[in-house]
Amino acid sequence: MTSLVSAQRLGIVAVDEAIPLELRSRSTEEEVDAVILAVYRQVLGNDHLMSQERLTSAESLLRGREISVRDFVRAVALSEVYRQKFFHSNPQNRFIELNYKHLLGRAPYDQSEIAFHTDLYHQGGYEAEINSYIDSVEYTENFGDWVVPYFRGFATQRNQKTVGFSRSFQVYRGYATSDRSQGNGSRSRLTRELARNTASPVYAGSTAESLRGTSAGSRNQMYRLQVIQGAAPGRGTRVRRGKAEYLVSYDNLSAKLQQINRQGDTVTMISLA
């Protein structure tokens, strides 16, 4: 847990002091309601949810303990509501960042995690991508079947990388904001840092100056690749042609272009980052 003074300065008191919610066999109706709302808040990135968008059937099953909290999280993440809010409206890298935040409660640690999930979606589609987080060992160890996922990027936990703390500020911009109302629109927040394997600047609030690490220093020239992903051979039309963005160093540019070509994807733009 971060010290109170530091948490106040960084604007993370609400997250730092939050108590995880767990659905128990003897939970009251009010406690069940709190769990359901907490799942919507976490998985949907604190975005406004209209009454007609609620998953009433899944809610009913959870109230009757016919499904677990993990199952309810899965239902929300696989729903058309989640797809419309985060899948259809974001590039692939941003979508993966949000999946890490919503389902595992942290920011991605390195480029290999982004690459893994990009390839997983390309090969297995939307459901495989979502299920990979919820069925992971990391999810089980932190939330199990009955705890509502929560943002834990500012905590110190086993198997957690230190760089995750600073990168968390890029995907978390305050308790009162939503993941669809932040600045920079749908652009990925971590593409540059992950590509360079450097730490993000830490901002003390929305308009304060940042405490910069190596990401603010000079580096070798990076190139930004914008890519349209083609469906894997033999797949149905239900898998969309997604967009992705990569930051690649000059030394790795040729190899990355060859990899993109082998995957059947199309590079639409190469520019200096």
Curated annotation (Swiss-Prot):
Consequence of substituting D47R: Significantly decreases interaction of PBS-linker domain with phycocyanin beta subunit (cpcB)
Chief subcellular location: membrane
Annotated phenotype, changing H48Y: Significantly decreases interaction of PBS-linker domain with phycocyanin beta subunit (cpcB)
Outcome of substituting E141R: No change in interaction of PBS-linker domain with phycocyanin beta subunit (cpcB)
Protein family: Belongs to the phycobilisome linker protein family.
This protein's domain notes: The N-terminal PBS-linker domain (residues 19-157 in this experiment) interacts with the C-phycocyanin beta subunit (cpcB).
Known partners and oligomeric status: Part of 2 PBS rod complexes, the conventional CpcG-PBS rod and a photosystem I-specific CpcL-PBS rod, both of which include ferredoxin--NADP reductase (petH). CpcG-PBS has on average 3 stacked phycocyanin hexamers (PC, CpcA and CpcB). Linker CpcG connects the PC stack to the thylakoid, the hexamers are linked by 1 copy of CpcC1, 1 copy of CpcC2 and the stack is terminated by a single copy of CpcD. The CpcL-PBS has on average 5 stacked phycocyanin hexamers (PC, CpcA and CpcB).
Name this protein carries in UniProt: Phycobilisome 32.1 kDa linker polypeptide, phycocyanin-associated, rod 2
The species this protein was found in: Synechocystis sp. (strain ATCC 27184 / PCC 6803 / Kazusa)
Record gene name: cpcC2
